[in-house]
């Protein structure tokens, strides 16, 4: 993805015959998703972000549907299935010094203070009490609590995290 945009949603299957589409939020809540101003779209076959011309967004319970401008039937809407919705990075709130966006942790290599590798962060689980880094190295998967007690250092520019954690924890 372009460095200038952050993915906030993905378009799913068509909904109804008038060209509405399911919208799957990648933000931490639907309210956060809807709070961003201008949205941009990246079609599945391209790496180009274009400003999205939406006609309407409908929220029903925990689902969101989008109607794009000039799309009036399901057949035309199908070309947008699996497209990404993004916002410019500058639209994101400024973080405090000790905060990070979880998306920036994905792909970071993780080693402990003894230089033992836990692989790379492939996912983050939100447990309620704290978040957990899901790290993969070859055929092994490691779960490391993402709390100050275990995170020794983070260098997101170099995509490196050092933890105070052992294989047998």
Swiss-Prot record:
Q: Where in the cell is it found?
A: Cytoplasm
Membrane spanning residue stretches: none
UniProt cross-references to InterPro entries, sorted A to Z: PRC_barrel-like_sf (IPR011033), PRC_RimM (IPR056792), RimM (IPR011961), RimM_N (IPR002676), RimM_N_sf (IPR036976), Transl_B-barrel_sf (IPR009000)
GO biological process, any: rRNA processing
Q: How does it assemble?
A: Binds ribosomal protein uS19.
Family to which the UniProt record says this protein belongs: Belongs to the RimM family.
Name this polypeptide is given: Ribosome maturation factor RimM
**Record organism:** Francisella tularensis subsp. tularensis (strain WY96-3418)
